[in-house]
Amino acid sequence: MNILAGDQSTSLIEPAALRAWAQDRYIFLELTDGRIVGFPADRFRILRSATNEQLKEVSLRLNGYALRWESLDEDITVPGVVAGRFQLPLGEEFVARVVA
């Protein structure tokens, strides 16, 4: 879908992921619009209990619009992550580190 504003056309297509990786219990995404976003694995119930090795098994599905962990049987949408829709709140220890 496009919105025309004067002579400019702005795309409203949500960005997809070009690649995904896990590092230090964070999941990172490189998006098609050039951004790199990351989130703590502990923001999702199944990922919270996963080992570091299991987290590293992340793969892209649906042309970069979904993340998949086969051994965990877990799928997460990239647009949901980009919009900040997580299952669990930030842990107190994370908030304390950021505030300090």
Regions found by a protein language model. Name each.
Residues 1-100:
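Motif-centric detector for short Cys/His coordination patterns
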